[in-house]
Regions:
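Extreme N-terminal basic, low-complexity initiation segments
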Residues: 2-10
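Intrinsically disordered, low-complexity segments enriched in serine/proline and basic residues
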Residues: 9-12, 37, 54-57
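Low-complexity, intrinsically disordered or signal/transmembrane-proximal segments
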Residues: 20, 27-30
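Alpha-helical transmembrane segments of multi-pass small-molecule/ion transporters
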Residues: 32-33, 45-376
Length: 376
């Protein structure tokens, strides 16, 4: 259904827009000295991790190296999608696998990464500012364009803003950064994940409740009630628990026994493939349902504007090369399913969220490849 719906979309126009964006960013790469410094100063070991060799930096065949890191991510998503469409598994099997990923595999990966991490005295605050500044700009632009250009209800505008800025950091970002940047990138992403979901859900909930109150009236919950609910969810969040245990292990200097370390490594290694396959299985529920103009616009904001803003802020704040690469790559991934969950919670904006998720996932391989190439 996803593929058939996507086929009806104006592929020629989208391809032309993609080529124009590609040419613009390529010009930016060659003219902007900051990007050149970033590219030329990448250590050899990280360049190789990104699929880059010194020789291939100056030649087009480098794109095949990018594809070697990016293509497996989307192939695994496609495999998950096909297993449900072919009738091999029911869609609810994907939900069970997703629960395993969120509650066991990813927290274990975060624990292992942080327990062994060397932070080199880096502060997480610049990392958080870098990412969420990009989110704030993109979310605001998405909201304003939907409200005043597409003339939509304020509640639809909020959902569109969320869809333009809510990256699928867990199910696509983690495997992508792990393959492309390595452990240093996973450290950055683990620190981001500690507050990403709470911040995005608090902001989305408050804005939606305010928008609903403006549109239809009725009782509005106070911010204290919202923070209380989110705080309650936060202390039981498996990602936060994995982060706290990992940091505690790192600070205390406790070493895992060989047997326990092997178990942790094996579970952590399952996080990426299981996350991608479960996402593909879940995508059978998120089809293109309408509001194509808004959805395509939000997809462009999500895949191009958000990572561009993140790169600009990270460069301005002097964030390390590896952390900047990790944040830009994870911000370039498709829209996460939480955008649809918020729409479902408030009973409006389903088509905008679902269509943006579907279109951004179908075209995400292009944006991820583009940003991996630019970062090289």
């Amino acid at each position: 259904m996803l593929l058939s719906a996507t086929a009806s979309f104006d592929v020629g126009r989208w391809s032309e827009l993609s080529r124009q964006a590609f040419r613009w960013f390529r010009q930016l790469l060659h003219e902007n000295k900051g990007v050149k410094r970033f590219r030329d100063s990448l250590p050899v070991e990280n360049a190789l991790k990104l699929g880059i060799s010194r020789k291939s930096r100056e030649s087009f065949p480098f794109m095949s190296a990018v594809a070697a890191n990016v293509a497996p991510i989307f192939i695994l998503i496609l495999i998950g999608w096909l297993t449900v469409k072919a009738g091999l598994f029911r869609a609810d099997v994907g939900e069970i696998l997703s629960d395993f990923v969120f509650k066991i595999a990813v927290p274990t990966l975060i624990f292992r990464t942080l327990a062994e991490a060397n932070f080199h005295g880096a502060s997480p605050f610049r990392l958080w500012i870098t990412y969420f500044a990009g989110v704030a700009v993109t979310w605001t632009v998405g909201h304003i364009v939907t409200r005043y250009v597409f003339k939509q209800d304020v509640r639809i505008a909020v959902i569109a803003g969320i869809s333009s800025a809510f990256a699928n950091n867990i199910f696509i970002g983690l495997p992508l950064v792990g393959r492309s940047v390595g452990d240093e990138g996973l450290v950055a992403l683990s620190i981001l994940l500690a507050i990403h979901l709470p911040v995005m859900m608090i902001a989305g909930t408050i804005l939606m409740e305010n928008a609903t109150h403006k549109a239809v009236g009725g009782e509005k919950r106070g911010m204290a009630a919202v923070f209380k609910q989110v705080g309650r969810n936060l202390i039981t969040n498996p990602l936060v628990i994995g982060l706290i245990i990992g940091l505690s292990t790192n600070v205390s200097g406790v070493s895992l026994t060989p047997i326990l370390k092997t178990v942790v490594e094996q579970i952590a290694s399952m996080a990426g493939p299981a996350a991608l396959i479960s996402l593909g299985m879940a995508l059978t529920k998120y089809t293109i349902r309408g509001n194509l103009g808004i959805a395509v616009t939000m997809t462009v904001f999500k895949l191009l504007l958000l990572p561009a803003c993140v790169w600009a802020v990270g460069h301005a704040l002097g964030l390390s090369r590896e952390w900047t690469a990790a944040l830009v790559l994870t911000s370039s991934v498709p829209t996460g399913v939480n955008a649809w969950l918020i729409a479902n919670r408030f009973g409006i904006g389903h088509s905008v969220a679902a269509s943006t998720i579907s279109i951004s996932t179908a075209t995400g391989v292009l944006s991820v490849s583009l940003w991996a190439w630019l970062l090289s």
